[in-house]
UniProtKB/Swiss-Prot annotation:
Catalytic residues (positions): H65, D109, S202
Gene: Mcptl
InterPro entries cross-referenced by the UniProt entry: Peptidase_S1_PA, Peptidase_S1_PA_chymotrypsin, Peptidase_S1A, Trypsin_dom, TRYPSIN_HIS, TRYPSIN_SER
SUPFAM superfamilies named in the record: Trypsin-like serine proteases
Annotated source species: Mus musculus
Protein name as annotated: Mast cell protease-like protein
Single GO MF descriptor: serine-type endopeptidase activity
Amino acid sequence: MQALLFLMALLLPSGAGAEEIIGGVESEPHSRPYMAYVNTFRRKGYVAICGGFLITPQFVMTAAHCRGRRMTVTLGAHNVRKRECTQQKIKVEKYILPPNYNVSSKFNDIVLLKLKKQANLTSAVDVVPLPGPSDFAKPGTMCWAAGWGRTGVKKIISHTLREVELKIVGEKACKIFRHYKDSLQICVGSSTKVASVYMGDSGGPLLCAGVAHGIVSSGRGNAKPPAIFTRISPHVPWINRVIKGK
């Protein structure tokens, strides 16, 4: 139930408290040029907010639960409430789900967004490297997450990109969740620290040594760590096939 509440909160309407990084700091403007601000337009004017990240000039990766019929991606943003000259706003042509995405368990919570046109790579817009198929981010590794979500349960949405350093922990810590599989997911965040991802950060990357190893997927409704990230490495063969159009 906690994971469900967290997921629902991740998809709050724009301006109504879509979640943010907890225990982090504001990022240096455009220091994370791969970050994408994803808007999913749903029925009755509802807009869901997620993070994402650019992996090729024409593909953005995010969480599968962030998908929708009409989506727009903003690249090169720091303050999403301003029209920064670095920003590139591009509509999504289509989304591609992995064949084994499980809605109920959130296993394989990953989706590729094909943009209607290629992004123009600049100092503020660039791609991030992915791991190899056998690269397994291990417990004890220190990584970084970033997003525009809330900074706390009762806090308002952040308009500027924020980041937080998080530690990968053992799978035992994520046994509090009904569904967790270490081969497909990463358990992130020490229970002894007030630092985590939260509502609105969903779909954003987990970077370890400059490589995107995970995608923000779900967590606890009270915002306390740990949180669950989708593990990217098992999906690399599928990702490569999609990018190559196979």
